[in-house]
Every structure is written in C-alpha cells, then in structure tokens.
Amino acid sequence: MAEESTDFSQFEEERNNDQYKVSAKKTVDEYKNLDAEDESLAKWKESLGLSSDVLPLEFPGDKRKVVVQKIQLLVNTEPNPITFDLTNEKTIKELASKRYKIKENSIYKLKIVFKVQHEIITGLRYVQYIKKAGIAVDKIDDHLGSYAPNTKTKPFYEVELPESEAPSGFLARGNYSAVSKFIDDDKTNHLTLNWGVEIVKK
C-alpha cells in the first residue's frame, strides 16, 4: 500500500489564525504562592494538584514536559482494547505502517495515559487530522485540560475522549491515515503520532 501524504496544512492554518492570547507561563512554585489568601483560587490550585507533596522528577535527565505513555483504542465490537505502547520508540515508528481494523458502525473511543513533569501544563489538547485516499476528511480537537506535575499518589493521568461511530457503506470502507498531536496553550507540540485504521464490513 502506498504511503499517504501527511500534509494537513489546511487544518493547521485554521489553528494558526486563532487570535486567543495566552498569559505568561508560571513555575510550579509561583502557582503555589499565587494569591495564597484567595479561597476560590486555592480550590482551583488544589484541583490542579498543587499541593506540598509535589515530588522531584523520577527521571531528572528527561526534558519532556508531557510524556504520553499509552493510547488505547476501545471498540464496542472487540473484547479487548488495542493498545499503543508509546514508551517504545520502535513501536511509535511501526504505527505509521499499521492499520487497525474497525468494523463499520462500531462505536469507539480513545483512552490516553500520560504524565506531566517539570511544570504545570495548561490547555492541553488532543488534535487529530484524518485522511482517506489522500484527501483530508476530518479533524478532531478535544480539550484534555490543565495538569500539574505528577506525584507518587498520582503517578499518571488518564483521559477518555468522547465516543465516535465508525462510518459505514461501500465508499466509507478502506484505509484511513491519522496524525495525532498533543498541543498546549503555548502551542508546544509534545508528541506527533502517525497511525491509521481500516474500516471493514461487518
């Protein structure tokens, strides 16, 4: 099968035209000391995990701020999830050439497991561009949230995206390529993942 182009510039242009302005980034300590007497702000900081038990990095040499460890594709017609182990560079590279079969009209969703380190990440989003036969057919842009660095009591975060229904019909069947990105409010892209699915007949 010929490799499809991953040029999704038309979608990128839409995002780059966004006029939303992001405030200056603060360190973990700055957030912890911010308006200490403000009760509502204190609750917001607590919801981000900004407590006194924030621990040093497990791997001090790792400069990544968002580490996506695993993605699971949950399909209602399959007994077990399809799991992408993203801690392995070889697995990440192999995903681009694989196509995971999903039956038409199936209900599916993604579960993302990740950790945050070094600093608070705000406005993390999962952005996915989808092509079929070289033509851009869809874009997904889901808000994941804002997160403080993980601790021993919270070693990772887990987020499930909304359910979707696989297309059906003769024209809808076939191979779809996807490019997934994890982008924050600073427009930092923490991971780009190339993968794909094949929609098959029931």
Curated annotation (Swiss-Prot):
Q: Which UniProt keywords apply?
A: Acetylation, Cytoplasm, GTPase activation, Phosphoprotein
GO CC, alphabetical: cellular bud neck; cellular bud tip; cytosol; membrane; plasma membrane
Task: Tell me the compartments it is located in.
Answer: Cytoplasm
Known Pfam families for this protein? Rho_GDI
Q: Name one GO molecular function term.
A: GTPase activator activity
Tell me the residues on which N-acetylalanine occurs.
2
Among Gene3D superfamilies, the record links this protein to: Coagulation Factor XIII, subunit A, domain 1
> Is Membrane included in the keywords of this UniProt record?
no
Phosphoserine PTM positions read 40
Q: Which of the residues bear the PTM Phosphothreonine?
A: 27
- Say where the protein is mainly found: cytoplasm
What InterPro entries does the annotation carry? Ig_E-set (IPR014756), Rho_GDI (IPR000406), RhoGDI_dom_sf (IPR024792)
The yes or no answer to whether the keyword Phosphoprotein is present is: yes
Q: Name one GO biological process term.
A: Rho protein signal transduction
Q: What more does the record tell us?
A: Present with 1670 molecules/cell in log phase SD medium.
Write out the function statement from the record.
Answer: Regulates the GDP/GTP exchange reaction of the Rho proteins by inhibiting the dissociation of GDP from them, and the subsequent binding of GTP to them.
Q: Give the protein family.
A: Belongs to the Rho GDI family.
The protein's name is: Rho GDP-dissociation inhibitor
Species of origin? Saccharomyces cerevisiae (strain ATCC 204508 / S288c)
Q: What gene, per UniProt, encodes this protein?
A: RDI1
